[in-house]
Amino acid sequence: WKDKFKNVEDFRRNNVNTVVRNIQKTIIETRPEVIFSISPAADMERNYNTLFADVNTWAKEGWVDVVIPQLYFATGNDATSFNLRLDLWSQYTYENHLLIGYGIYKFGDSQYGSKFQSSDDLMKQFELASAKPKVKGSVLYSAKNLVENKVGIADAVKAIYGKKVLPPYLGRTAAVLPPTPDNIRLNGADLSWGAVSNVAYYAIYKDNGKERKADLVGITQGTSFKLSEKGVYFVTSLFKNNAESEISETVSY
């Protein structure tokens, strides 16, 4: 390694970089629709100097599609706190998408301190992350702990994610949008539209009239949907990778 690198640490980082780059290359060549994600430790310095994982380079070069830092810490003012590390990871998001990893396994376990003895801090963590425009979603570790619902963490998650939403587009390039559904029509409570070629499914929304927001009512692979309550509705089409079209014309039921 001495012929090509200044030190053994750079040599090791290059080896890891090569593995990451080759994994992505293989995915693109064989299954380009597959999303390549990596979940690094929360401590960037430890990643770089101890694990030889140069996550910042992976993100800048676009070698990984999704980064999910393991922010398994309580909120606070010290360097290891959830909020300070959230700020740091949000600053170092480039070609990749950013999802946040939550350590829900710590909640209800006395060895992890007072903030993990109720769901209040988990709610606060969600609120902090939702205020970051670059954060695309959440990953909870682990499913087992969510089912156990210690200190009400499952109830907290239900409260945060009380409304239906679609999975985000996490592709490695700018999304190519499908055509917008047209010929939107109503026959009683039956909403229907013209078929769009090569899409995976359609999403039906109800306009709530507030700040240009709408609520997801349901999804279907067909071209019709039965409405259950009065309101203003529109439809979108989605590819398999969750790239979503512009909204259709609205209809009132």
PLM ranges: what are they?
Residues 244-253:
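Edge beta-strands of extracellular beta-sandwich domains
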Residues 175-184:
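Proline-enriched interdomain boundary motifs that mark the N-terminal boundary
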Residues 63-79, 89, 94-173:
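Substrate-binding cleft of secreted/luminal carbohydrate-active enzymes
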Residues 225-244:
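Beta-strand-rich modules
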Residues 188-198:
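Conserved aromatic anchor
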Residues 202-204:
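Short beta-strand elements bearing conserved aromatic residues within extracellular beta-rich modules
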Residues 1-57, 61, 72-73:
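Polysaccharide-binding and catalytic clefts of secreted carbohydrate-active enzymes
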Residues 215-222:
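Short beta-strand segments within Ig-like beta-sandwich modules, predominantly Fibronectin type-III
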